[in-house]
Amino acid sequence: MTNIRKSHPLIKIINHSFIDLPAPSNISAWWNFGSLLGVCLMLQIITGLFLAMHYTADTTTAFSSVTHICRDVNYGWLIRYLHANGASMFFILLYLHIGRGIYYGSFTFMETWNIGVLLLFAVMATAFMGYVLPWGQMSFWGATVITNLLSAIPYIGPNLVEWIWGGFSVDKATLTRFFAFHFILPFIITAMVMIHLLFLHETGSNNPSGLNSDSDKIPFHPYYTIKDILGFLFMLLTLMTLVLFTPDLLGDPDNYTPANPLNTPPHIKPEWYFLFAYAILRSIPNKLGGVLALVLSILILMLFPMLHLSKQRSMSFRPLSQCLLWALVGNLIILTWIGGQPVEHPFITIGQLASAIYFFIILILMPTTSLMENKLLKW
């Protein structure tokens, strides 16, 4: 009799995805981030569900309901901070996952990569709308500033903004719809993750060498299940340290002041994980130009398969490209720092330079370096 694991229509799918899945024998810890992101998504959905049970999406009571969760609900403070810092964890893992994809040439799996970029957009939208829900000062003004960017779209812009607001300013209607979207999007993300995995399992995983690994595969369970569990423990340790010792480390103190449409905070800035994009947005004096640069800074990821001119898939054996990638990482760190600074003399210039360098490295330097390395192979 065949094992139920292999014969049952539903369990069979799980078996082919997580148990008997043939995986390359040499994938490193950089391949742990996919499963960590899955765990993070589940954690966010569970904590979010419990928060939604006590939260009220109304401008008069939203801020108080969050306070009530933290003070009066059993372990409400823990659930709230797990959810808030879980988002930061999510983005750390997401950026590492994307970095891994760029370094090892995983973007050559076009379908998987493009679904991944769409996933990034969906997660960013979800995080932005979630930040609006506590209805603090930064929530309100962040929502006002970011939604206002859509007014830069020619002809339909102003109408579009009012349509999204549900009125002539960010108000009750905006908060209610943002809560609805923030609730539904993670489930859409979960469905997209399944498609992401479906496409990945069509081709099989990439590996650090960038070479075909069909001749040397091992079963996912127990080898990589145990390796993933180690990753979960590290992630949990980091997250719990953050939540239990410094829960407000990554937050903005302004968000502990209830939203006041009559008082603008001195520095409006998003959460840390959006600062690099915010810096790119601010570095262009023109509104529409800034919005385009902002969208392109993420959308540029879709161009990676086209910009890949090297004869080798992975960067493992390409030291010059490695240097460029690490320069890009450094540049992104500088952009993140600039995004959190006021719009004043040295920061404006640094931001503009870093933004230009960001696009220059990806669009010009990386492809030309790849061609040069191809030449060096013959030399």
Swiss-Prot record:
Keyword entries, A-Z: Electron transport, Heme, Iron, Membrane, Metal-binding, Mitochondrion, Mitochondrion inner membrane, Respiratory chain, Transmembrane, Transmembrane helix, Transport, Ubiquinone
GO cellular component, one term: respiratory chain complex III
Binding of heme b b566, residues: H97, H196
Note on how the cofactor is bound: Binds 2 heme b groups non-covalently.
Record field: transmembrane: 33-53, 77-98, 113-133, 178-198, 226-246, 288-308, 320-340, 347-367
Cofactor dependence: heme b
Topology with respect to the bilayer: Multi-pass membrane protein
Binding-site residues for heme b b562, renumbered to this chain: H83, H182
CDD domains for this protein: cytochrome_b_C, Cytochrome_b_N
Localization per Swiss-Prot or TrEMBL: Mitochondrion inner membrane
Highest taxon above the source species: Eukaryota
Binding locations of a ubiquinone: H201
One of the record's GO molecular function terms: metal ion binding
Gene Ontology BP annotations: mitochondrial electron transport, ubiquinol to cytochrome c
Main location: mitochondrion
Presence of the UniProt keyword Iron in the record: yes
Family per record: Belongs to the cytochrome b family.
Cited function: Component of the ubiquinol-cytochrome c reductase complex (complex III or cytochrome b-c1 complex) that is part of the mitochondrial respiratory chain. The b-c1 complex mediates electron transfer from ubiquinol to cytochrome c. Contributes to the generation of a proton gradient across the mitochondrial membrane that is then used for ATP synthesis.
PANTHER family per record: CYTOCHROME B
Miscellaneous comment text of the record: Heme 1 (or BL or b562) is low-potential and absorbs at about 562 nm, and heme 2 (or BH or b566) is high-potential and absorbs at about 566 nm.
Subunit structure: The cytochrome bc1 complex contains 11 subunits: 3 respiratory subunits (MT-CYB, CYC1 and UQCRFS1), 2 core proteins (UQCRC1 and UQCRC2) and 6 low-molecular weight proteins (UQCRH/QCR6, UQCRB/QCR7, UQCRQ/QCR8, UQCR10/QCR9, UQCR11/QCR10 and a cleavage product of UQCRFS1). This cytochrome bc1 complex then forms a dimer.
Protein name: Cytochrome b
Organism from which the protein derives: Octodon degus (Degu)
